Amino acid sequence: MARNKSRRLLWAVCLAALAAFAAAMVWLHYQQLCSPGGGSDPYTSDLGMHLAFAQRGMVYSTVSLLIGPAYALAGRIGIAVLLAAFHLAAVAVFACGLRTALPDAPRPARLLVSLVVNLATAVWMPRGGYWYQGTVGGTIYHNTTYIMLAPFALLAMLAFYRVWPTMRDDLDLRSYAVYTVLLTVATSFKASLIFAFAPALLVLLIADFVRTRAKNLKNEIIMGCSVFPGVALCFIQANVLFAEEGSGIRLIFTVPFGHHRMLWGPFNEAGVLGLARSFVFVAAVGLLLGRAAWQRFRYRFSLFTFAVSLAEALLLVESGERLYHANLWWGPFICFWVFWLESVSVFLQQTRTGAAPRWRLAVCAAALAWHIVSGVCFLVMLLQGVSYNVPILTYNLW
C-alpha cells in the first residue's frame, strides 16, 4: 500500500512538473510568434520566419507541413501548443535513453531526471561572452525546425544503437527498418543530424570492413544504404533553400574572411568562451569517468558524431545570400544533445553503482548542477523578455 502511494505521488509530481514546463513553453512560443522579429524585439526568434515560409507555400521540410495546419486550426496558439508537445516528446525520448543507466528507476523518476537535465545550458561565468552566441547546447527554445527535429533525431540514434550489435551475425532487419524510417523522418524535419551521422557511419563501416577482413560485407552494405533516403531528402531541401544563384556550401577558407565574421567558433572571444562554457560537464565526465565511459559504444560513437559535426561547422560555411545563416551549427547542437545523453547516462550509472571515487562523482555533479542552474536562469530570462542573443551584462566589465 505504501509503495503504491509513493508511486502515485511520484507520478503526480512528475505530471505537475511536465505540465508546468509545457505551459511555460506554450507561453514563450506564443510570445515569440507574436514578435515582429528583426532581432530588436525581446522575443525575437525563428518561429515567425518559419510560419511566414509556410504561409507563402515554401515547403522544404515536414515542419512546413505541420505548422500551416496548426495555424489554420488555432492560430499562433496552435503552433505554440504543437511546439510544446514536441518539447515534451523530447523529454520522453531522453528518458527512454536513460533506461540503461537507471534500469530499476520507475518511469516518472526517469522523466523527472530527463526534464531537469534538459534544462541545462552553457554555464554562466563572469566575462563569459554571450548566453547563447558561441555556445553549443542541446535544448533550444527559438528554432521551429530544431525543436521538431530533436525527438526524432534521438529516436533514430537509439534505434541505431539497437541494430548495430546485430551487425556481427544476422542483421535484425526489423530493427534496421525502424531505424531507417526514424532517420529518414528526422531528416525530413532538418538535415542537421544526418549531415554528421552519415560520415560517422561511413567511418564505422570502414573500420568494420577492415576488422572483419571483408567477411561482413553484405551487412555493411545494407547498413550503409540506411542513409540513402535521408540523403535524398537533403537534396530536395537543398533545391529549395539554395535556390538563389551563388548559394551553396563552401570551405570557410574559400570565403573572404572580411565578408564572413564567424558568429561561433575560434575566431572571436565570445566564440571561444562560449565553447568552453558548453563542455564543463561532458569534459568532467570524460576526464574523471573516462574508463567507464569509453567502454560504452554509445558514448564513443556519440562523441565521434559530435566531433564530425563540430568539424563540419568550423570548416564549412553557407555561401551566397545564406552567408550569415550559420545553419551548419545546428549539427553540433543536435549531436551534442545525443552526446549529452550518453554523458549523463555514464554519470548516473557510476553514481548508482558507486564504482567511481566519490570526489570524482562530486565534481561531475557540481558541473551538472552548474549547467542546470545556468539553464534555469537562461529560461527565466527568456520568459521575462530578454532576447536569447543579448550579451550578458558582465561581458565587458572585467
Predicted regions: what is each one?
Residues 109-161, 326-336:
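Membrane-interface micro-motifs in multi-pass membrane enzymes
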Residues 227, 231, 242-398:
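Transmembrane helical bundles and short interhelical boundary loops of multi-pass, membrane-embedded
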